[in-house]
């Protein structure tokens, strides 16, 4: 009888605790804000090659700009030129 009563009281207490849980909103701090991304397009000599993303990143690195993501596309096929559209973590634009 004691164990049954203890079990019932435990269940009621757990139910009460779980029913009073509130949703907590996160506080936005300066460190957690989403930073804006700068996008820039540049035409380079040569084609995209096997890995256009890395080819574009190397092309921008040569001109002292450091993107974190690039997409390579053909700009002028007869002259073997590519266009790189890259995203930068800060604004070189």
Curated annotation (Swiss-Prot):
Subcellular location: Secreted
Signal peptide location: 1-19
Keyword NAD listed: no
Domain of life per record: Eukaryota
Disulfide bonds: 38-93, 48-72, 56-84, 70-86
Alphabetical keyword list: Antimicrobial, Disulfide bond, Fungicide, Plant defense, Secreted, Signal
Pfam families per the UniProt record, alphabetical: SCRL
Tissue expression pattern: Flower buds.
Name listed for the protein in its UniProt record: Defensin-like protein 229
Species, as recorded: Arabidopsis thaliana (Mouse-ear cress)
């Amino acid at each position: 009888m004691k164990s049954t009563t203890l079990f019932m009281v435990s269940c009621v207490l757990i139910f009460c605790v779980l029913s009073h849980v509130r949703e907590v909103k996160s506080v936005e701090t300066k460190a957690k804000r989403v930073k804006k991304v700068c996008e820039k397009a540049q035409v380079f000599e040569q084609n995209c090659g096997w890995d256009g993303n890395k080819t574009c990143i190397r092309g921008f690195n040569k001109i002292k700009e450091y993107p974190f993501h690039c997409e390579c596309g053909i700009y002028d096929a007869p002259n073997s030129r590519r266009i790189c559209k890259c995203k930068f973590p800060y604004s070189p634009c």
